Amino acid sequence: MFDDLPTLTHAEQQVAVEKIQKLMAEGISTGEAIKIVAQQIREDKKAQNQGTH
């Protein structure tokens, strides 16, 4: 499930945790919140990588 998840800095990990916690506070399940945030991270990293090439 996380094989294609890019490596994150500690600060990026903290932001991801905060996003997951916010989604969970809104009533989304833990698994779904992780899935949503992981997809956002993948998309952000992909966009960053495309911008550098």
Swiss-Prot record:
InterPro entries in the cross-refs: UPF0181
Taxonomy, superkingdom: Bacteria
A Pfam family annotated for this UniProt entry: UPF0181
Similarity comment text for this entry: Belongs to the UPF0181 family.
Protein name listed in UniProt: UPF0181 protein VC_A0569
